[in-house]
From Swiss-Prot:
Protein name per the record: Glycine--tRNA ligase
Binding site for ATP: 245-247, 255-260, 333-334, 400-403
Biological source species: Rhodopirellula baltica (strain DSM 10527 / NCIMB 13988 / SH1)
Protein family (similarity comment): Belongs to the class-II aminoacyl-tRNA synthetase family.
Keywords: Aminoacyl-tRNA synthetase, ATP-binding, Cytoplasm, Ligase, Nucleotide-binding, Protein biosynthesis
EC number: 6.1.1.14
Catalytic reaction(s) noted: tRNA(Gly) + glycine + ATP = glycyl-tRNA(Gly) + AMP + diphosphate
InterPro entries named among the record's database cross-references: aa-tRNA-synt_IIb (IPR002314), aa-tRNA-synth_II (IPR006195), aa-tRNA-synth_II/BPL/LPL (IPR045864), Anticodon-bd (IPR004154), Anticodon-bd_dom_sf (IPR036621), Gly-tRNA_synthase/POLG2 (IPR027031), Gly_tRNA_ligase_bac (IPR022961), GlyRS-like_core (IPR033731)
Location(s), subcellular: Cytoplasm
């Protein structure tokens, strides 16, 4: 993982936000290559899920035909939205504070191991990455027991890595930044929404929140979309946009950030068909990731147990990826596909529903009134053919664009061997990104900067630039230019050499196979287009 992080900074995929001032934890900036990768990822999602969907044909596995439309909602919404959605009361993580270091940690994210010395057993916790965890636990354990290096074998470190929430007690826990045991407080709830203030006065009535998810903007616009676009159930509304969560301990590169981008669909269907649609979207979303290059061996589909379900969920399945910073055998969430039932639309009609009731009813305050009053608007749907009126059920495929980009970067990072310009095999680093996701689709090189080669190369570059993001490079040995493009994930490199001036052909080199083929100059654009089309 360290090698990938280093490459991402060195080649301009990702930078720590505000790095010249020491950075801000949980915030990341996308560099020139990273912004293209992420844009390509979002474009692929939007095309495959929304704009490219054919509503006249029923896709394989779908119960029927359906429509898809898009939406772009504001980051700041009426505060009542978050009260009725349940986020105001229920959107929290459990945190612990260290009385000694005064630092705060997320209870279920801090890992560690039990260590034992002369019959005394303690739990040493750490924030180190998984690759360094055992060494860091051993180092801190030796320091706690005041052991010298020559006595290192007297300390036993258990192999099993655990998070704090798996322990019966924290009394014998050495906190990540503490020197003594038992300094952690009992876990308590911490609301993850960022507060902000509207207007100049800044009173309590002016307090609102940065959205923690894009979904609620879709729900409160449900009636607007139905009335304006004439869509009929079943249909979906897609949205891509920024969300914000005040994570207690952001970590693992961009995996857990405080500002992130979501790609979400809220799919509205008849309650009687909701389970069929849930299965359809679960399977379709899994297939999307493998089609773009994530291996089946690195992905799992995990159904949530009842006790894991969010307050709004009837059922949820997570698509999870084996990120390299996680312990072997563990997976991190890429996307959740949730069966939200009618929770959201009813909550925004009637008021916040109580998930503890079955069937769910509006949660009341001590005076017997709705705790958080809904809009009072009728968000039920009337079928103009059957005249049936009902509150639609919702299936929500919710993907993180940043986590997906990170997964594709992890999957793409490869070290193999390739010949240099002298034919000697050398280790190369290559990002084997799917051509649809690659930041640069092709690079154009003149072999040397003379004899008319730059002019031909520039003409090819200009023709390709009308269709794709391409790169022109005339500096250095051609082997080093290949290596630079391999690290950028560029699938095709086009070289203009001495023969190009006589036979009017160029060499196209494939990033993954290293195969080089001669193609007529006039056919270069169509050849690249053909190869790009074959990858879709």
């Amino acid at each position: 993982m360290d090698a990938l992080v280093s490459l991402c900074k060195r080649r301009g995929f990702l930078f720590q936000s505000s790095e010249i001032y020491g950075g801000v934890q949980g915030f990341w900036d996308y560099g020139p290559l990273g912004v293209e990768l992420k844009r390509n990822l979002k474009d692929a999602w939007w095309h495959d899920m929304i704009s490219g969907h054919n509503e006249l044909v029923s896709p394989a596995g779908a119960p029927s035909t359906f429509e898809m439309v898009g939406l772009d909602c504001t980051i700041i919404m009426h505060p009542q939205v978050w009260k009725c959605s349940g986020h105001y009361d229920l959107f929290h993580d459990h945190m612990v504070d260290c009385r000694e270091s005064k630092k705060r940690y997320r209870f279920d994210q801090v890992r560690g191991r039990f260590v034992e010395y002369q019959g005394t057993k303690i739990f040493v916790s750490t924030l180190a990455e998984i690759e360094q965890e055992e060494d860091e636990v051993r180092r801190r354990g030796m320091k706690f027991f005041k052991l010298r290096p020559k006595n290192a074998d007297e300390l036993t470190v258990e192999k099993e890595s655990l998070t704090l929430d798996k322990l019966d007690s924290t009394d014998n826990v050495l906190a990540p930044d503490a020197k003594t045991l038992g300094t952690l407080t009992e876990p308590r709830e911490f609301n993850l929404m960022f507060k902000t203030t509207l207007g100049a006065l800044g009173g309590e009535e002016d307090t609102t929140f940065l959205r923690p998810e894009t979904a609620q903007g879709i729900f409160v616009n449900f009636k607007n979309v139905v009335d304006s676009s004439r869509v009929r159930i079943p249909f979906g509304i897609g949205q891509v946009g920024k969300s914000f969560r005040n994570e207690i301990t952001p970590r693992n590169f961009t995996f857990r950030s405080r500002e992130f981008e979501q790609m979400e669909i809220e799919f509205f269907c008849h309650p009687n068909q909701s389970q069929e649609w849930y299965r359809y979207w679960r399977d379709r979303r899994m297939a999307w990731y493998t089609k773009l290059g994530l291996s089946n061996e690195s992905l799992i589909m995990r159904e949530h147990h009842t006790e894991e379900l969010a307050h709004y969920s009837v059922g949820t399945a997570d698509i999870e990826y084996a990120f390299p910073f996680l312990p072997e055998g563990e997976y991190g969430e890429l996307e959740g596909i949730a069966h939200r039932g009618d929770f959201d639309l009813r909550s925004h009609m009637e008021g916040k529903l109580d998930p503890a009731t079955n069937p769910m009813t509006v949660e009341l305050n001590e005076h017997g009134k709705p705790k958080h009053r809904g809009s009072g608007k009728d968000l039920a749907y009337r079928d103009d053919i059957t005249n049936e009126k009902f509150v639609p059920h919702v299936i929500e495929p919710s993907a993180g664009a940043d986590r997906a980009a990170l997964a594709f970067l992890c999957e793409a990072y490869t070290e193999d061997e390739a010949p240099d310009e002298n034919g000697k095999m050398q280790t190369r680093t290559v990002m084997k990104l799917d051509p649809r996701l690659a930041p640069i689709k092709a690079a154009v090189f003149p072999l040397v900067k003379k004899d008319g080669m730059p002019e031909v190369a520039q003409e090819i570059y200009g023709a390709l630039k009308e269709h794709y993001n391409v790169f022109y490079d005339a500096k250095g040995a051609v082997g080093r230019r290949y290596r630079r493009q391999d690290e950028a994930g560029t699938p095709y490199c086009i070289t203009v050499d001495g023969d190009s001036l006589t036979d009017k052909t160029v060499t196209i080199r494939d990033r993954d196979t290293l195969e080089q083929t001669r193609v007529k100059i006039d056919d270069v654009v169509s050849e690249i287009q053909s190869r790009m089309k074959a990858s879709t």
